[in-house]
UniProtKB/Swiss-Prot annotation:
Stored InterPro entries: Smg
Protein name (database record): Protein Smg homolog
Family the entry assigns: Belongs to the Smg family.
Species of the source: Pseudoalteromonas atlantica (strain T6c / ATCC BAA-1087)
Pfam families cross-referenced by the UniProt entry: DUF494
Gene: smg
């Protein structure tokens, strides 16, 4: 499923190509690209749920609340999915104002919906990028996250 999300993001969303509204046509294209139908439906459902997070009457993620820094206590299930490196990265993103508590919760929500046994920091970075892309007014945070994702390490590697 995550491979399909990456494919869609890189080929349609991130490249600013016009996204087809016809889900059947998009599904056919993904099948031709070699993806399995059940995984395609899971990925499309994941994207629909991401879009639904903006509907404040359903999930009040985008309702403005207090902006003070809050320590996030993770559930056992979240700790099993998000290793210490991923959780530390989320905290880092909050500290540099790429994420706020609202977008952090959106990221965690989307991570927990990914149907994959393995999830790593690189996957986390892509989920953050997808979430920020879909939140109005987060263009600067998206650009900053894009820089973090694609920047090459400087200096010699030891």
């Amino acid at each position: 499923m995550f491979d399909i999300l990456m494919y869609l993001f890189e080929n349609f969303i991130h490249s600013e190509t016009e996204i087809r509204v016809d889900q059947d046509e998009l599904t056919d294209e993904l099948v031709r690209a070699g993806f399995h139908q059940d995984e395609i439906y899971k990925a499309l459902s994941w994207l629909e749920k991401l879009a639904a997070l903006q509907e404040t009457d359903i999930n009040p993620y985008l309702v403005k609340g207090p902006t003070s820094f809050v320590t996030r206590i993770y559930t056992h299930e979240e700790e099993m999915r998000l290793d210490i490196e991923c959780r530390g990265f989320l905290m880092f993103l909050e500290q540099i104002n790429v994420l706020d508590s609202t977008t952090r919760e959106m990221v965690i929500d989307r991570v927990m919906e990914i149907d994959s046994k393995e999830f790593c920091l690189e996957d986390m970075k892509w989920v953050v990028l997808m979430v920020l892309f879909n939140v109005p007014g987060k263009e600067n945070a998206y650009a900053q996250m894009e820089d973090l994702l694609f920047e090459e390490p400087e200096g010699p590697l030891h």
